[in-house]
């Protein structure tokens, strides 16, 4: 009999409705509902990036792109929008739609909060999803405003802090505090990937590993070292087999 402290190992190639997870783990009930998720990537614009001070813009862009790639890989619906893209806020970063061609762009008419735009809200509601993963720039405005409103309307809301950016550390910290008070869940891009990943016993595991490399350069170094070690081991084995022959 398996106990809570014993690992569960599945046979090679076993497929289940949870992509290799034989049953719904107890802990899964507190994680993102992967069957009910919509991703909102809001106002990742070149002009707004120039005012981001709480995270490097390179890291922010990499994390936002990783989320878009995750959505494309796992067929998570995505809605994007931009705030006055023809003005000083600048255009939406192209990487998002390049990584997730299925993403739906909703134009706005100047509303600061995407949730104040009727077409945007209509597009969200038409998906039928009630779990929202939101990232954007600025965190304290473009993420917080729709996040708080959606939460008040009954949505489960996750705010991806490191795929978002703010003009200062103080702005980011106070926003996270307000999220927590309102019941919005602060989360990292890495955690989002992990909560959708759940198990290495799945055919797209290598592609998911690539996403970890995007959000963690150190993980990329680890994977490179592992791959090289595998190559050396294979060469050594081949030489040994040739010598015996």
Predicted regions located by residue number:
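Active-site acidic carboxylates
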Residues: 2-110, 126, 156, 173-177, ...
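Short, ordered loop/turn segments at secondary-structure junctions
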Residues: 83-84, 111, 162-165, 191-192
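Acidic, metal-coordinating catalytic cores used for nucleic-acid/nucleotide bond scission
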Residues: 84-87, 111-114, 139-143, 168
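Distinct, well-ordered alpha-helical segments
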Residues: 89-96, 120-121, 146-148
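Short phosphate-binding loop-to-helix
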Residues: 109-122
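Long, charged low-complexity segments
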Residues: 112-114, 126, 150
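Glycine-rich phosphate-binding loop signature in dinucleotide/nucleotide-binding domains
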Residues: 124-130
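A contiguous pocket-lining binding segment that forms or flanks enzyme active sites
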Residues: 131-189
């Amino acid at each position: 009999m398996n106990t809570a402290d014993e690992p569960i190992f599945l046979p090679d190639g076993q497929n289940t409705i949870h992509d290799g997870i034989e049953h719904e783990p107890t802990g899964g009930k507190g994680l993102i509902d992967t069957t009910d998720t919509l991703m909102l990537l809001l106002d990742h614009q070149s002009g707004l990036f120039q005012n981001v001070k709480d995270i490097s813009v390179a890291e922010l862009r990499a994390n936002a792109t990783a989320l878009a790639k995750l959505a494309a890989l796992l067929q998570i619906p995505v809605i994007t929008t931009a705030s006055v893209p023809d003005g000083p806020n600048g255009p939406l970063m192209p990487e998002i739609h390049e990584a997730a061609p299925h993403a739906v762009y909703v134009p706005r008419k100047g509303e600061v909060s995407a949730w104040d735009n009727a077409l945007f809200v209509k597009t969200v509601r038409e998906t039928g999803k009630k779990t929202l993963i939101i990232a954007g720039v600025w965190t304290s405005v473009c993420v917080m405003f729709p996040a708080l409103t959606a939460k008040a309307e009954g949505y489960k809301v996750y705010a991806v802090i490191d795929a978002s950016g703010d003009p200062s550390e103080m702005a980011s910290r106070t926003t996270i505090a307000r999220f927590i008070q309102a019941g919005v869940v602060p989360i990292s891009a890495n955690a989002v990937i992990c909560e959708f990943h759940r198990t290495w016993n799945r055919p797209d595991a290598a592609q998911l590993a690539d996403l970890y490399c995007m959000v963690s350069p150190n993980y990329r170094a680890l994977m490179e070292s592992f791959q090289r070690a595998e190559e050396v081991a294979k060469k050594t084995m081949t030489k040994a087999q040739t010598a015996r022959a």
